[in-house]
Amino acid sequence: MSNKKEMILRVLEKMGYKPEIDNDGDILLRYQMKTIFVLIGNEDEQYISVMLPQFHEIADGEETLVLAVCNKMTRELKLAKVYVDQTFKNVSATCEFFYSNEEALEQCLAHSLELLGVVRSVFRKNKTELSEE
């Protein structure tokens, strides 16, 4: 296991979570009844992506509305990217960041988890508001 992955696991455990490693080698954890993935990328880069995958399925005919909601959220939420994933059938969200040390990693992970914890509710609210316009 890489030093980077070990540090991320250690920080998540320190924060009170029980992270696991999936078959692809990604870190996953449960947060507010959601499965969150931590994608570590290159070992030599102090950069990670925290992802809430496929939290909304796109119904036929709502593609334009969903794209507008994703754009609005990505524009308004600091740190978060909300986007239609590669399948064009689901919406996912990520928080991507660089960190300088273990303390910064912990702070950024805490903020990312908090943000991803509410992104689904904010998405639904924005979708309702935009569909009424």
Spans of features found by a protein language model:
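Long, continuous compositionally biased terminal/linker segments
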Residues: 32-63
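Short amphipathic alpha-helical segments
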Residues: 3-7, 58-66, 104, 108-115
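Well-ordered alpha/beta subsegment
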Residues: 88-111, 124-125
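Short, internal acidic amphipathic alpha-helical interface segments
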Residues: 52-90
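Charge-rich, low-complexity N-terminal segments
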Residues: 1-37, 84-85
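Short, highly charged C-terminal tails/helix-capping segments
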Residues: 127-133
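Long, charge-dense
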Residues: 115, 119-126
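Hydrophobic residues embedded in beta-strands of well-ordered beta-sheets
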Residues: 26-28, 46-48, 89-91
